[in-house]
Amino acid sequence: MIMIKKWSLFFLLFITSVFYMFSKDKQVYLYQVDPLIKVLKERNYFRDETDTIRVARGEVASVQIVVQGLTEIRNMQATVTHISSGLSKLAGATTGWVGYVRVGRSYNPPSKDIIRSVSGYFPDPIIPDSAFSIKPGEIQPLWISIPTDAATVPGLYKGTVEITGEVGKKKKAWYKEFYIRIYPVTLGKSPLYITNWSAHFNPVTLSYLNNNNPVEAYSPLYWELIGIHAKLMASHRQNVHRIYPIWHTLYTYNDGKYTFDFSRFDKEAEIFDAVGALERIEGGHLAWRSGAWDDPFFVEVPLPDNEETAQLRVSPNPKKVENGIRFTLLPVEDERAKNFITQFLPAFKQHLEQRGWLDRYMQHIADEPTAKNASSYVTISNYIHEFLPGVKVLDAVLTSKELAGAIDIWVPVLNVLHNDYAFYQDLKKEGKEIWFYTCVGPRGNYANRFIELPLNQTRYLHWINYKYDATGYLHWGLNYWVEDQLNADASRDRGRLPAGDNCIIYPGYRKLYSSIRFEAMRDGIDDYQLLKMVERKDEKRAKRYADAIIFNFNDYEASVTSFRSVRKQILDFLSQP
C-alpha cells in the first residue's frame, strides 16, 4: 500500500511537471475556423475545424486561422510558405489580419440571426500590411486568400502558413497546415450583374486615401486612386460601374448653345474596362429630389455661373462650379432644362456609338422614386427614351405599379421584390430585366450585408438572385467612408445607418483594404455561377440546391455545415463527365 502511494505520488508529480513544462512552452494555439464564421474578440473556446476548403478553378480559396495566445505576442506576421499537390503548386497566396470595428448602436428591427457582441466590436476589415500583437488569452483571426484560375491543376493541395512573433525578447515561429481541394470545374465570366456604388468622385472620399490631404479632381493621383478602386472591384466580381455623364463632362455655353467634352468620362470607363469591371456602364443619375423625400424630381442642368443661377437649387455635384458653369436643379418642364436635355442626350448618344459603348450603357434617372413623386420620374423617363433611344433605364425603386412603362431594368429593394413578386414576374414576361438591391433596409429577417449579420447571409444575397431569377444586384455603399473609418463607430450618423451599410471596403494610404464581408459577397457571386452551371445540366437539381439554402425571401439555412454540404454536392455534381 505504501509502495502504491509512493508510485501514485511520483506519477502525480511527473504528470504535473510535464503539464507545467507543456504549458510553459506552449505559447500559442492555432485553430482553423470556417471563414463564414465571424470570430468575436470575446470568444475563448475553439475546436480545430480542419475541414478541406473546396473550390472550383477560378474561385478564391479562403482560410481562416485563429491565433490564441497564452502569453503576450508582439509584431505577429504571417506568410504562406507553400501550397502543393505533387508537382503542382499554388502561387499568389496573401495573408491579412482581421481587424475589428466598433458598433455603437445595433439596428432595429433585428434579424433572428443577429450576432450580439459583448465587447461591441465585430470582425470586418482585412489588414495585410501591418503586424498585429495580442495580450495573454487574446485571440486574433488571420485571413488567407489563395487565388486559382482556369489553368490550376485539380487535386488536393496541402498548404502551410508560418506565423512569427516576439515573445519576450525572442522571435518565435508557429506553423499550421491546411488543405484545399481544387475541383475540375472552371468558372467563366460571371453572368450576374453586380454594382456597389463608389464615392470616389468626391474629393473628401479620396482624401481618406491620402492621409486626409486633398486630391485634385482629374490629377494623376486622382486617376491612380481610381485605378486602385477598379482593380479591387474587378477582383471581387463587380462588373457594372456607375459613372456620372453630367458630372464628368466639360462644358462651354454660349447664347443657349452647349459644347461637350466627354474625355474624362471616357478615361474612367477605360480604366474599369481594362481590368474587366465594365460589362455594363451604369450612367449616374440625371435628376434629384427637389426637396423632401416625396417631392418631385428636378433635372440637373449646367448653366452659366452668375447671380441668377446662384439662386437656383444646387446640384449634389461635388464641383458645384467648373469652367464658368454652375450645376443646378430645374423642373424638367423648365425651358432651360429642355434646352440642355435636347442637346446633351443626342450628343452623348452619338459619342457612345463612336466608342462602341452604346449597347453596354444603361441610364439612371433618379434614385428610389416613391408613389408620390413617380409622375415627375415618368416625365423625365419619357425624355430619356426619346433622346437616348435603345438605352435602358434602370433605377432602384421603392414602389412598383406607379412606374410601369418608365423603367427597363427594375431594381426593387428586396422586400418590395418579395411583396410584389407577381408584378415583377409579369414584367419579366414583357422582356424587362429584374435585379434587386439592399441598403439601410430591408431589416428584420432579410439578408443584407450588415456587420451584425452572419457572413452566410451576405453570401446568400446571390443565392436569392438565383432562386428568384434576379439577374443583378445593387448596393449604394462601396466606400462612403467617414474620417478614420477603421476606428470609427461603424453605425454611421448617430445610428441611422446599420453598421456596414456605408462601406464594404476600407481606406489605407493610397491603398484599399477588403473585408470579410466583401470576400463573402464575391464567393456568393461565384456560387450563382455554379448554380447556373448546374442548371444547364439539370434544372431540377439546381432548384433543389437553391431551395436547400433559401427557404423564402427572408428565411434561410443558418447552418454553415449544411451550406458547406450543399456546396460540396454542387462541385461533386459538376465534376462528373
Describe each region flagged by the PLM.
Residues 453-503:
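Substrate-binding cleft of secreted/luminal carbohydrate-active enzymes
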Residues 114-115, 122-127, 131, 138, ...:
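Aromatic-lined carbohydrate-binding surfaces of glycoside hydrolases
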Residues 1-25:
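Bacterial Sec-dependent N-terminal signal peptides
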Residues 312-377, 382-398, 486-577:
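Catalytic domains of carbohydrate-active enzymes that cleave complex glycans
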Residues 429-458:
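Active-site clefts of carbohydrate-active enzymes
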Residues 64-68, 145-147:
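Short edge beta-strand/loop segments characteristic of extracellular beta-sandwich folds
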